[in-house]
Amino acid sequence: MENTRMTIHMCYLTILLLLALLAPPCTPVSDTDDGSNSAGVDGSHRARAEATVADILSAHNEARRKVGVEPLKWSQGIARYAKDYARSRRADCAPRRSSLFYFGENIEVGKGRRWGAGALVAQWVDEGRWYDYGSSSCSAPAGSSGCGRYTQVVWRNTTQLGCGKIVCDSGDTLLVCDYFPPGNYGTGRPY
């Protein structure tokens, strides 16, 4: 009788061990994240995260190249901060600046979940059409975002960038990019 109980217990333990080994991870990868904090994610999600980072850097550095400014480098630490802040806005998806003024910051909301990060950054770069370098002024129409997001993208003293992209509860896409050192300070020109 004792031998039979021991055999049954061993069978149960073996089955539990097999189930644990075959079960999916406890924290599945969500389609609401871009993967910029990619520890422990599957290969396809990591590839999407790397493509998102490449799109963001490419869009920024192309705008910087056009005005003769050095390219930005990606910072994982800054990206973690940006991602955490973006996640804190998941419920309202509001493009409000974070309280940490140590970084420069650009925020964009795209209607719907399929916005690519490069397309969101392009909205900031597009503000450059209203920026006049000669007078260091902005002629953006009333009600627009102005030129401040563009000037942050091309600010010559900024060297590092980190961003976080999420899909909000509303289904819209929120992109937060933080910059170090911050731009848009003083009365100087961005480049």
List the predicted regions and their residue ranges.
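N-terminal signal peptide
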Residues: 17-35, 39-42
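Short clusters of hydrophobic/aromatic residues that line enzyme substrate/ligand-binding pockets
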Residues: 72, 107, 153
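A solvent-exposed, acidic/Ser-Thr-rich amphipathic alpha-helical stretch
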Residues: 95-121
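Disulfide-stabilized extracellular recognition modules
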Residues: 29-31, 111-191
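Classical eukaryotic N-terminal signal peptides for Sec-dependent ER targeting/secretion
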Residues: 1-16
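Short, well-ordered surface patches within globular domains
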Residues: 41-104
